[in-house]
């Protein structure tokens, strides 16, 4: 079952939300969520559900053994080994046995991979690791099974840690605001998948199909323009597809009262390869950082060990994505660029440290010379106090002119633009490695990017297809940038400011009411005329404050009404367009279902 299927959208999800909202109490809601999660996973096959239950039961047992015998590391090693062996058997057995397949009496089908096994295996590994490190206590089987099988995140993540869900499993609330925001996020992700990602995938296959070598062998190879457009549309597809699922998962989580961590932060806006991986599949990157990279020493080690740590992390990252050599090559490709950027950062830190040390020694000598010069030339001292010379205690500092500041700003913007283009190019060629599992096709596709083996620089059919999809292309580009995110944030900030103003007015009215009794006691100190005037002025001031509070409250209600009306209307529009797209086109599964 997939989030982007009609059965899920029109049947499974409405039934779940109806029962989930009707059932009172967190414990009962947890059981409803658990039952629907098991039904969701059962759609993939009973044997895969039994496997998930078995892995959860083993992790439950080893969790208690690790906690009770914390000094004995063997239980932790055995538990992690069983989880990894299970993952390796189902995901990599065909990969390692591929040379022996002709000799085997049975066939290993590609559909052998259970749904979400990479994601729930890593979640269980993080669960045992956190118990071993003392960051988490062993949990009940029901809580652990819900954490493992939660249908929001079972198939494509994010890889949530148990401690990130622990508080919500015990106590959470469902507010109308959370329901509205969650459904908006879900419908936004659904439309991103059905309206943008699926069509981008079709265009990628049209411009540069996976079997383009067959057309090339018949004398009809793609043009350079077609090869680049195929790569660009695949680059857009894989981001829009995977981020769409994350949007839908986070939206469903918010509807149910969970606050899952963000998994994407507009990675195509990054300015370095390291920055890209801080924004792309954040939960996977943080998993390898916390459970592989940092235990090996992280970056605070010698250069050879740093190289070893990064090589292991990126080889595992590539293997995690798929059982094929092109994924290993893809991971090593990123290792190369990450290593270069780390070496550059190390060199910059060393140069800065040397400069700081040099400034400390040379700076004292220069300051002494400047003190002597200032005593001999008092006019320089006066000019220095006006900011025209180097400031005392800040060697080499002087106030920049407007022209110098503008030039400096242009240089910074130019460097940021170049670093952004460099990052996009690295990521673009990385997706070429990621897409083609056949090495002959991969090498031919890389050659096509530089015009080697292409039919021409461009061809009319490709140009016409691009022209017909130009608006769609810009829509995909805009969806890959944080523009609409910033618009939504500004709307939310406006609503939050209105809420804060309302709270201030309420606190002010409470202070006025609290002071009424004090004012009544004080009025007896004046004569009757002064008492009447003071009481009248007090009533007028109170009415003004109450009138202002009512106006602010009405304005807040209007702002909240129109804000949620816009969100609800947008969600319904996205949902309607997505349903029409699902009805009118063939089904395309999420790309990351294969991982």
Describe the predicted segments one by one.
Residues 1-594:
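Membrane-embedded transmembrane alpha-helical bundles that form the catalytic cores
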